[in-house]
Amino acid sequence: MDNIEQRVKKIVAEQLGVAEADIKNESSFVNDLGADSLDTVELVMALEDEFGMEIPDEEAEKITTVQQAIDYARANVKA
């Protein structure tokens, strides 16, 4: 597990109140981790803060799983 993956999973755990051990890359924020629409907005904001990036609304709507969040962060974080 790389640094970005660890950071994303830590944020997901903190924002959604789930154990990091229960978070799998294929986990859906809504279906598997119990997030509602407000949770997903707060999750996106936390990811933006953590990685110093801005996620446009149309992109944020496409991020529905842990893996999609990891992939987005990897593609958009400045090294």
From Swiss-Prot:
Entries under InterPro entries matching the protein = ACP (IPR003231), ACP-like_sf (IPR036736), PP-bd_ACP (IPR009081), Ppantetheine_attach_site (IPR006162)
Q: Which domain of life is it from?
A: Bacteria
Mind telling me which PROSITE patterns this protein's record contains? CARRIER (PS50075), PHOSPHOPANTETHEINE (PS00012)
Q: Which Pfam families does this one have?
A: PP-binding
Q: Which residues carry this modification: O-(pantetheine 4'-phosphoryl)serine?
A: S37
Q: Mind telling me which GO cellular component terms the entry cites?
A: cytosol; membrane
Q: List the disulfide bonds.
A: none
Question: After translation, how is this protein modified?
Answer: 4'-phosphopantetheine is transferred from CoA to a specific serine of apo-ACP by AcpS. This modification is essential for activity because fatty acids are bound in thioester linkage to the sulfhydryl of the prosthetic group.
* Keyword Phosphoprotein applies: yes
Which GO BP terms sit in this record? lipid A biosynthetic process
- Would you indicate the residue range of the signal peptide? none
Q: In which pathway does it act?
A: Lipid metabolism; fatty acid biosynthesis
Q: Name one GO molecular function term.
A: acyl binding
Q: Where in the cell is it found?
A: Cytoplasm
Query: What keywords are annotated for this sequence in UniProt?
Result: Cytoplasm, Fatty acid biosynthesis, Fatty acid metabolism, Lipid biosynthesis, Lipid metabolism, Phosphopantetheine, Phosphoprotein
Q: Where is the Carrier domain?
A: 2-77
Q: What does this protein do?
A: Carrier of the growing fatty acid chain in fatty acid biosynthesis.
UniProt xrefs under HAMAP family: Acyl_carrier
UniProt lists the family membership as follows: Belongs to the acyl carrier protein (ACP) family.
Q: State the protein's name.
A: Acyl carrier protein 1
Q: Which organism is it from?
A: Ralstonia nicotianae (strain ATCC BAA-1114 / GMI1000)
